[in-house]
């Protein structure tokens, strides 16, 4: 079980992702934008940040950069409909973020998260 923060501006996608990850046994919190996610990251530790690349205000890449300052152990996975275009020319991204392109199947999302996290313990435990 991992503690996951989902940052996604689309309400239905955010709910869909959170529900699937909870059914897979993870503890999930959600944020509607990058600024809300930063506030949540300041209050608690997470194992994984699952962020949409394109969000109003603060995009997922900037969110990941800021999150890495406070939680360097945080794993990052981006979800986007156009990963190659959205991430082109983005230098200074923390760690080795994974990218999952929309559309995707839930079993692929869960499998990639499980692979990314391995047997990591719950953050803050």
Residue ranges and their predicted role:
Residues 5, 30-48, 68-69:
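Acidic, metal-coordinating helix/loop segments flanking the phosphotransfer/catalytic sites
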Residues 52, 80:
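Active-site residues of response regulator receiver
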Residues 33-36, 59-63:
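Acidic catalytic/metal-coordinating carboxylates
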Residues 8:
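Conserved acidic carboxylate
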Residues 26, 42-46, 66-74, 85-94:
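Conserved phosphotransfer cores of two-component systems
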Residues 55:
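Receiver (REC) domain active-site loop signature in two-component systems and cognate sites
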Residues 15-23:
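Charged docking surfaces used in two-component/phosphorelay signaling
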Residues 62, 82-101, 107-112:
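Alpha4 helix (beta4-alpha4-beta5 surface) of REC/receiver domains from two-component response regulators
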């Amino acid at each position: 079980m991992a503690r996951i923060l989902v940052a996604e501006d689309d309400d239905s996608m955010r709910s869909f992702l959170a529900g699937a990850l909870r059914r897979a046994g993870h503890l999930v919190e959600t944020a509607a934008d990058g600024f809300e996610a930063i506030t949540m990251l300041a209050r608690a530790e997470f194992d994984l940040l699952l962020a949409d690349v394109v969000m109003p205000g603060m995009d997922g890449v900037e969110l990941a950069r800021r999150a890495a300052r406070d939680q360097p152990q945080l794993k990052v996975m981006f979800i986007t409909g156009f990963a190659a275009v959205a991430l082109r020319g983005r230098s200074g991204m923390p760690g080795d973020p994974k990218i999952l392109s929309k559309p995707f199947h839930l079993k692929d999302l869960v499998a990639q998260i499980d692979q990314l996290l391995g047997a990591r313990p719950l953050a803050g435990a």
